[in-house]
């Protein structure tokens, strides 16, 4: 009764109005699962391949009909007849069917859509929540949210090199309260921006994208919003950055060229100077996490940054690790970073995603489950965060339904878990000496 009888994919739109995949999986019993695939704007060069059509006459070349056809004509034929509960076998079968190291033949977007839909169908068959199916009986930790309330870099037109300025409500007693802290700070920030005559339009991830005078102006404004909402920076709420440094790293000159986003007169820094600058910010402000502070291929820079700040601040590898156990294993071996960002579409299956999270935990690295800038209403990452007890989630600001969908799912999960639910706040940063 749990045997897969049909697999069907269609082209739908993501939060940026670009095509993506939606996949449905059906079983003999009538159990059903649906998965939708996100898409990134700033992507690591080592990520699994997102298959696009390249036909400029249709969606500007971004169509996903090839990936849809690969699901309907190739993957479906291969996995119909499998037990929907055998996630690993199905994921491994798709990886083997693709046969490339980066899923470039069938497309990681095609494979991931099926992987998510299979898990959801299995949970539906067993009549249990997705987080329970994925994580078993020990699922209880609600993640500390990293809320991206200021968008810069490739996520907005704001003249700031850093891609994300985040708040982390670590002092809240529950996830529900953490969400309230964040929402109140978000609205306080909007009032401050309006009072300064700055833009309050939002970027791809729901954060504001005002024309600040620079990074420190952005941080100071966020601190003012935290206080205006009645909270204490460095106690109730900390700050985090996603530098997305690969987006402004000049490979030829081997420098971090802030002029790409901030214009003429902005800084151009060597690796050593980039580390000095990040340390200066950490010493000045209540910063607890920095993502992609160095370029994805600047291994020496990453090791030096970790040596300098790795005991004080969470140093998250996103483009650096691309949710890949090979890169993560090297990072662990060489002492580079102390945390990994987990994006399901960077690697392409739930099985490989869970392997990366497990490897990180075993090495004492934290794992931050993350959205992409091009999202959908699919809330699977909320269930993954709880299923793995990851302790942290990054899923955007306090606006845009594609972001709020994940927060609302976490509220439901917290309610369902009842007294068992744990919100660890600062304790989620077990890689730091605090």
Curated annotation (Swiss-Prot):
Region (Antigenic epitope): 55-63
Superkingdom of source: Bacteria
An annotated GO BP: cell adhesion
Entry's localization field: Cytoplasm; Secreted; Cell surface; Secreted, Capsule
EC assignment: 4.2.1.11
Record's catalysed reaction(s): (2R)-2-phosphoglycerate = phosphoenolpyruvate + H2O
Motif Plasminogen-binding peptide boundaries: 248-256
Cofactor note as given: Binds a second Mg(2+) ion via substrate during catalysis.
Pathway: Carbohydrate degradation; glycolysis; pyruvate from D-glyceraldehyde 3-phosphate: step 4/5
Enzyme class per UniProt: lyase
Active site per the UniProt annotation: 205 (proton donor), 343 (proton acceptor)
Keywords: Cell adhesion, Cell wall, Cytoplasm, Glycolysis, Lyase, Magnesium, Metal-binding, Secreted, Virulence
Cofactors demanded by this protein: Mg(2+)
A GO cellular component annotation in the UniProt record: capsule
PROSITE patterns linked to this entry: ENOLASE
Major location category of this protein: cytoplasm
One GO MF term: magnesium ion binding
Complex and partners: Homooctamer formed by a tetramer of dimers. Forms a ring-shaped structure.
UniProt family annotation: Belongs to the enolase family.
Name the record gives this protein: Enolase
Name of the gene this protein is made from: eno
């Amino acid at each position: 009764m749990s045997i897969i009888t049909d697999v069907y994919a269609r082209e739908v739109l993501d939060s940026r109005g670009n095509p993506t995949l939606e996949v449905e999986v059906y079983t003999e019993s009538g159990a059903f699962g649906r998965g939708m695939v996100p898409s990134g704007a700033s992507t690591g060069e080592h990520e699994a391949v997102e298959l696009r059509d390249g036909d400029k006459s249709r969606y500007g070349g971004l169509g996903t009909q090839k990936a849809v056809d690969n699901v309907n004509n190739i993957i479906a034929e291969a996995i119909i007849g499998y037990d929907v509960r055998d996630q690993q076998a199905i994921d491994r079968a798709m990886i083997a069917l693709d046969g490339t190291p980066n899923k470039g033949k069938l497309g990681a977007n095609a494979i991931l859509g099926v992987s998510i839909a299979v898990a959801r169908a299995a949970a539906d068959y067993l009549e249990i929540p997705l987080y329970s199916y994925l994580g078993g009986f020990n699922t209880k930790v609600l993640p500390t949210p990293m809320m991206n309330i200021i968008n810069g870099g490739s996520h907005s037109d704001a003249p700031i090199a850093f891609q994300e300025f985040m708040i982390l409500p670590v002092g809240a007693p529950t996830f529900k309260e953490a969400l309230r802290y964040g929402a109140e700070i978000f609205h306080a920030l909007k009032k401050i921006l309006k009072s300064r005559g700055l833009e309050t339009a939002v970027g791809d991830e729901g954060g504001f994208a005002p024309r600040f005078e620079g990074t420190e102006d952005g941080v100071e404004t966020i601190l003012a919003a935290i206080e205006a909402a009645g909270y204490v920076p460095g106690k109730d709420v900390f700050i985090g950055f996603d530098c997305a440094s690969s987006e402004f790293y000049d490979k030829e000159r081997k420098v971090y060229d802030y002029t790409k986003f901030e214009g003429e007169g902005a800084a151009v820094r060597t690796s050593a100077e980039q580390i000095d600058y990040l340390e200066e910010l950490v010493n000045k402000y209540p910063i607890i996490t920095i993502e992609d502070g160095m370029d994805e291929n600047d291994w020496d820079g990453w090791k030096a940054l970790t040596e300098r700040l790795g005991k004080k601040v969470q140093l998250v590898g996103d483009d650096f690790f691309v949710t890949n156990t090979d890169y993560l294993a090297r990072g662990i071996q060489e002492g580079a970073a102390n945390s990994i960002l987990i994006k399901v579409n960077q690697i392409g299956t739930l099985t490989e995603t869970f392997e990366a999270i497990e490897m990180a935990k075993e090495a004492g690295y934290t794992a931050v489950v993350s959205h992409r800038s091009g999202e959908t209403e699919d809330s699977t990452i909320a269930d993954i965060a709880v299923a793995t007890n990851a302790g942290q989630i990054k899923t955007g600001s306090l606006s845009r339904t594609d972001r709020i969908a994940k927060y609302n799912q976490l509220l439901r999960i917290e309610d369902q878990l009842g007294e068992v639910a744990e919100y660890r706040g600062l304790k989620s940063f077990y890689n730091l000496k605090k």
